[in-house]
Design a protein with these regions (language model features):
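Short, flexible, mixed-charge acidic loops at enzyme active sites
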Residues: 19-23, 123-130, 231-244
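Acidic-and-aromatic substrate-binding clefts and catalytic sites of carbohydrate-active enzymes
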Residues: 16-21, 39-54, 74-80, 124, ...
Length: 307
């Protein structure tokens, strides 16, 4: 088992580049390195500089490599497709200008990856974690989303050689078990893989261990996070947006929550997964003073159980 443990700017509350409380990007890189990570995601489009001449020296200074960039946007609306493709070209151009990640032995596709996440729908945002009441897309709108995902993935791969991976996410139109199964049926593995996230699987009512086992044949990239069960129970009983729940502390350092990480370690070994795992812990950026301690604690816990 060859694993490269990475982190992401969301651990510092970076999910919306327009949030006025975001920490400086240089601080995020510095603290990621201090916590023992050697890989980091770009975060939302435009948080880290899109100019490789600025970003590459900062990465070199902190001994970090970029493991992924992310499309975190409305994948459903046809009118948004030009923006999705603009971001795809921008992210992939930057990724190709940065030093490449070393491919791990046994890894299916070398990083960096392009992570694709649907987001930006109020009705689904307020229904995060509630499969019973979350409105589903009709056939035409689902087909449009699949077409847009294919377009993004094909540009990433055929133009830049970057593997696209689809990330089911709380509050988006790919969240619950039925949507994940439908996605896998509609998007073949040669077009895009999966980035499964233990925290989002649990939030959506799925068992992370069982889900990773079920979709191991499609799994190219992993996200690890943990959930505070007390806060989770509270927010599920409120009318609340997903990131408002994160601001309440629903995500916690790995090993302090409800997810069974020793079981996940055993499963990762059993499956022979090789490659990258990115640690995440969404929060309000106004609480980023605790980020260094939290990401360091998550890294130490994972190392202690064998990752």
């Amino acid at each position: 088992m060859t694993i490269h443990i990475c982190t992401a700017p969301c651990c510092w509350g970076v999910d919306d580049v327009n949030n006025p409380f975001l920490p400086p990007w240089q601080r995020v890189l510095d603290e990621a390195a201090k916590a023992g990570y050697r890989g980091i995601e770009l975060g939302p489009y435009g948080f880290l500089p899109l100019d490789a001449g600025i970003l590459e020296p900062a990465l070199s200074k902190t001994d970090l490599q970029v493991v992924a960039g992310t499309i975190f946007d409305d994948l459903v609306s046809p009118a948004n497709l030009p923006e999705l493709l603009r971001q795809t070209h921008g992210i992939c151009t930057l990724l190709k200008q940065l030093p490449p990640m070393k491919q791990q032995a046994g890894q299916r596709f070398a990083g960096p990856y392009l992570v694709i996440i649907d987001w930006g729908h109020d009705a689904r945002d307020y229904a995060a974690g509630h499969s019973d009441r979350a409105p589903r897309l009709d056939g035409a709108r689902w087909s449009a989303m699949m077409t847009h995902i294919r377009a993004i993935a094909e540009v990433a791969w055929h133009t830049y050689g970057i593997r696209a991976v689809i990330h089911p996410h709380a509050g988006g139109h790919i969240e619950f078990a039925d949507e994940l199964a439908r996605l896998v049926d509609d998007i073949p593995h040669e077009v895009a893989g999966l980035c499964l996230d233990t925290g989002h699987l649990y939030y959506a009512g799925m068992d992370p261990v069982a889900s990773l086992r079920t979709y191991a044949h499609r799994l190219d990239y992993l996200h690890f996070k943990d959930i505070d069960p007390t806060v989770f129970d509270q927010v599920l009983n409120e009318h609340i947006r997903f990131f408002a729940a994160c601001a309440r502390g629903v995500m916690c350092p790995i090993g302090r929550g409800v997810i069974d990480y020793p079981a996940l370690h055993s499963l990762v070994q059993e499956l022979g997964y090789h490659g990258c795992i990115t640690v995440e812990q969404e929060r309000d950026p106004r609480d980023a003073a605790a980020s260094l301690d939290d990401v360091a604690a998550s890294r130490a816990y994972l190392a202690n159980i064998g990752f």
